[in-house]
Amino acid sequence: MRQSTYLAPTMRDVPADAEAISHQLMLRAGMMRQIAAGVYAYLPLAKRTIAKIEAIIREELDAIGAQELTLPSLHPAELWQASGRWEAMGDELVRLKDRHNRDFALGPTHEEVITSLIKDGIASYKKLPLCVYQVQTKFRDERRPRFGLLRGREFIMKDAYSFHDSPESLDEAYWQMHGAYSRIFTRVGLEFRPVIADSGAMGGKDTHEFMALASVGEDTVVYSDGSDYAANLEMAKAALPEAPSVQAHGLLEKRATPEAKTVDEAAEALGFDADDIFKALVVVVDDVLSLFILRGNDELNEVKALHELGAKTLRMASEEEVVAAFGATPGSIGPVGVKDVPIYADYRIRSMERIACGANETGYHYVNVGPGRDYEVTAYKDLRTVREGDPSPDGKGTLRFAEGIEIGQIFKLGTRYSESLDAKYLDGQGKAQPFLMGCYGIGVSRTLAAVIEQHHDEAGIVWPKAVAPFDVHLLALNVKNEDQKTLAEQLYSDIRQAGIDVLYDDRPERAGVKFKDADLIGLPVRVAVGKRAGEGIIEVKVRKTGEQLELTASELVRWLNDFLRE
């Protein structure tokens, strides 16, 4: 491809509103342009890389027996109303009406549509298992689009769906897809971790997110430095502490703490360490007022709490609800003497030997609090957000934190959608059964951005070979020089005939401009035809390592083939 006629308008300055490196470099390298907030046009360089990412995805999914199809982007509201997500998705669902005043949505995902399709197309267990996938543009009305392709209103996604007649079949497909995802992200050149995750609005039970490690990541990855344990912060666990063998608490004593409204203020007033004071939180769990107690330095993890309690909803009680139930304001709440409210304690409470807590009287705290003697726990649960340095739950190593970009997620949906849309098949006994389902997503445009986040330097992008828009950037440094132009044209022809993708910079620009643009675009190899063209000598530079060498024109194609096969 000749750069003189190629749509790749490079920019020298960093756009003021571009925060993420991938956003900055894609704009500067002429890969995309913004049309509206969170909406982008992909220019030819980006399209070529996206095509390579999609090709890798197709190869790996086809290899495990998945079949490609295309589903509509326009979804009738009735399907989403049947699943309950028409309301649950809230403002993020892009809604519209047709000329007949019928409600539709632009699909952010396709569980409802594919379930409806399979409901009408598969009648017998003999057709199962089945796995289908598509690569398509999705839509989500983000409140605050940012970071370019990492959080947009329109994005490219691969979504796959599997249908099964047994938990064992679903489990096999889930782990097959887990392996395929690992191969896909390895092939595109990403450093990533599969992490235990929360299914959120998707429903279902088991799920893993695939997180690309990057400083711009909006999610926190928690991993063990001594094993392969990894989870997102919402779901991460730490090893549970053991209760001390002897607990001597002394006589329960009430002390005045009139200025203490927080754990830290209570600690200062009582002369205690904050971690020796109960953090008591009044929480409404599925409409039941409950009391959660954690150590003072810990934070409640609401997602984990929902899972631990098997609850559907959880919210913090209002101050009015707290006062009505406990007779005190929130800073003075504790479990002592509480009888009619369920008390859920974090496991770390069990290791406390010196305990203080609110006395359920505004401006007072108890010290020398003894479990069993002064209060009873309904159940111990894992309620806290883990901290870096906690022991790993598998007993191997300690927990470390890293920032990550979610690039994929896989789910075991179970019968969440098949039951709500009444999608059933006949089993071996002729009895109607709801399909067991799995769903599996990859953010294709996010993957593109994640690759750039991990592969760049001060000069620009540094493409991994597998997804580079072109393999080679050929530069004619002075197109007015006959020797240079003639040799560059010959090399352009030779490289193309060898089946190697080449971008040929034949523009009438200065050599310095061409070098800067080549570094910015970041193709794996730069071939410069310069002053020694009359001798048949060219300069080759490897973008990743900076290695430079001189070759004769006759050696180039063989060297390129060897390099690209490495």
From Swiss-Prot:
Transmembrane intervals: none
GO cellular component labels: cytosol
Catalytic activity, EC: 6.1.1.15
Cellular localization per UniProt: Cytoplasm
Keyword Nucleotide-binding: yes
Gene Ontology BP, a term: prolyl-tRNA aminoacylation
MF-aspect GO terms: aminoacyl-tRNA deacylase activity; ATP binding; catalytic activity, acting on a protein; proline-tRNA ligase activity; transferase activity
Catalytic activity: tRNA(Pro) + L-proline + ATP = L-prolyl-tRNA(Pro) + AMP + diphosphate
Keyword entries, A-Z: Aminoacyl-tRNA synthetase, ATP-binding, Cytoplasm, Ligase, Nucleotide-binding, Protein biosynthesis
Top EC category: ligase
Signal peptide annotation: none
Family designation: Belongs to the class-II aminoacyl-tRNA synthetase family. ProS type 1 subfamily.
NCBIfam families (alphabetical): PRK09194.1 (NF006625), proS_fam_II (TIGR00409)
UniProt xrefs under PANTHER family: MITOCHONDRIAL RIBOSOME PROTEIN L39/PROLYL-TRNA LIGASE FAMILY MEMBER, PROLINE--TRNA LIGASE
Entry function: Catalyzes the attachment of proline to tRNA(Pro) in a two-step reaction: proline is first activated by ATP to form Pro-AMP and then transferred to the acceptor end of tRNA(Pro). As ProRS can inadvertently accommodate and process non-cognate amino acids such as alanine and cysteine, to avoid such errors it has two additional distinct editing activities against alanine. One activity is designated as 'pretransfer' editing and involves the tRNA(Pro)-independent hydrolysis of activated Ala-AMP.
Subunit and partners: Homodimer.
Domain writeup: Consists of three domains: the N-terminal catalytic domain, the editing domain and the C-terminal anticodon-binding domain.
Protein name, per record: Proline--tRNA ligase
Lineage: Bacteria, Bacillati, Bacillota, Bacilli, Bacillales
Recorded name of the encoding gene: proS
